[in-house]
Amino acid sequence: MESKVIWSDVLRSWLPKANIFVRMFVNHCQRDGITVSAGHLAYVSLLSLVPFIMVFFTILSAFPAFSEVRGDIEALIFGNFIPTSGDQIQGYVAEFVGNASKMGAIGILSLVVVALLLISNIDKTLNRIWQAKSERPIIFTFAIYWMILTLGPLLIGLSVIMSSYLVAFANSAEAYTMGATTAMLKIVPFIASVCAFFILYMIVPNKRINPRHALVGAFMGALLFELSKKGFSFYITHFPSYQMIYGAMAVIPILFVWVYLSWIVVLLGAELTHVIEVFFHEESKENFTQVDEDDPQSPA
């Protein structure tokens, strides 16, 4: 009986706070116009897709250790991050990258600039969500962009190698633990998504971010990303009306819609991280004020 009373009191104390938190989250999403920002980033992403992937694999090709896992990296990118039509899109992108690689030094440099512009747009959008007033020095900003562009491919390559080792280990343990390989294949992409969201929310904002808040936002972003992939794949598979309308060109709207949904997920995770920080900051100020008012020795 006492436990029921305790849980009832806990619910009464937390329900109003949960209501305030949800309203704050919705208001922040509406204020920042994440649907409009996601559309802008989706458009820029599609324009930057070929330059970014070309720079990505050019950096990887400089390291012979990653040459053997290039196919696995492509499968990771197009299989896990683009549900359905991944093989078709992969073929188109590979052809575009092959054509772009025949360009001269000036053309390749322009592709690098386009890839950096994509990172710049992501940076500005996330900093607008966090309301970062101060701007970084240009040299520092360029250094961060370049670090993301160069270290990003290396981190993904290392994650693929580690995933291969984990899956191989799971295969060897399959005889002792049934379903180990299947579980590993499901867990590793999710953990990789959480790490990617966490790094994004920690590094990009020009503010000090609490790692715990960023981890919550990263976990929610990765969860929404996985659910979006399942839902999008289900819709594409069971309601193929887009193929009747667009025919052979159906892959283009599919890719655009998926990139748009992906950016909405990224921005929702960023908003959640920011709202958690604002909510706990306001709550701590309210608690401090309440304690100060209840203290009889506090100055009038």
UniProtKB/Swiss-Prot annotation:
The answer to whether the entry has keyword Ribonucleoprotein is: no
**InterPro entries documented for this protein:** UPF0761_bac, Virul_fac_BrkB
Where does it localize? Answer: Cell inner membrane
How does this chain sit within the bilayer? Multi-pass membrane protein
Membrane-spanning parts: 46-66, 103-123, 138-158, 184-204, 214-234, 248-268
Q: Does the keyword Membrane apply?
A: yes
Q: Which GO cellular component terms, listed alphabetically, does the Swiss-Prot or TrEMBL entry include?
A: plasma membrane
Any idea which UniProt keywords this protein has? Cell inner membrane, Cell membrane, Membrane, Transmembrane, Transmembrane helix
The text of the family note is: Belongs to the UPF0761 family.
* Name used for this protein in its record: UPF0761 membrane protein Patl_3954
Origin organism of this chain? Answer: Pseudoalteromonas atlantica (strain T6c / ATCC BAA-1087)
Q: What is the lineage of its organism?
A: Bacteria, Pseudomonadati, Pseudomonadota, Gammaproteobacteria, Alteromonadales
